[in-house]
Amino acid sequence: MYQIVLASGSPRRKEILSQVGINFTVCVSNMEEITSETLPENIVMELSKMKAHDIAKQYETNTIIIGSDTIVAYKNQILGKPKNEDHAKEMLQLLSGVTHEVYTGVTVIIKNDSGEVEERTFFEISKVTVSDLTEEEIMDYIKSKEPMDKAGAYAVQGRFAAHVTRIEGDYYTIVGLPIARLYQEVKKFGIDLVKQM
């Protein structure tokens, strides 16, 4: 039996794991998220790896550590979490009326009962199309405070859903954890994540 550890404080990621019946604990990595990578897929994979490795040091055996990172990209611009309300407004104006990509990288570190380590890192990409946003809609959304801790300054599963006209790819990638891919990747090691209770 493995202890499953989510190396993230994200309420969305916690919700996804709980939703499918996975029993897990949360151990938040406080490391600074700095990378020299420039491609969105490499950024999210490297940051997910850094988070997972940071937390993995605290566990010896029988543990599955899951690190994840999500960013939004549009025309080679990387959009992380907004620094302030003005920054959120800039991001939302940029995404208004266009299709952008959401990248989520995941690293899974598995430490078995003899302390041997297996590791897998992958990423998923989904596309999101946003309707044309008025200035008033942007300001109302920012006033809700919802955008402030979200990559790209929006939550597809929250109030912003009213402005999302199309999604291509996995919805959970956009929320922050591609659960079906995660399940399949861990299954390759002969482990059923849902049965680890």
From Swiss-Prot:
Pfam families: Maf. One of its GO terms (cellular component) is cytoplasm. Its EC number is 3.6.1.9. Belongs to the Maf family. YhdE subfamily. Nucleoside triphosphate pyrophosphatase that hydrolyzes dTTP and UTP. May have a dual role in cell division arrest and in preventing the incorporation of modified nucleotides into cellular nucleic acids. It catalyses: dTTP + H2O = dTMP + diphosphate + H(+); UTP + H2O = UMP + diphosphate + H(+). Gene3D superfamilies: 3.90.950.10. The active site is at 69 (proton acceptor). Its cofactor is a divalent metal cation. Signal peptide: none annotated. This is dTTP/UTP pyrophosphatase. InterPro entries: ITPase-like_fam, Maf-like. It is found in: Cytoplasm. The keyword Hydrolase applies. Keywords: Cytoplasm, Hydrolase, Nucleotide metabolism. GO terms for molecular function: dTTP diphosphatase activity; UTP diphosphatase activity. GO terms for biological process: nucleotide metabolic process. It is an enzyme of class 3 (hydrolase). The keyword Cytoplasm applies. The record marks 12, 70, 157 as: Important for substrate specificity. It comes from the Bacteria.
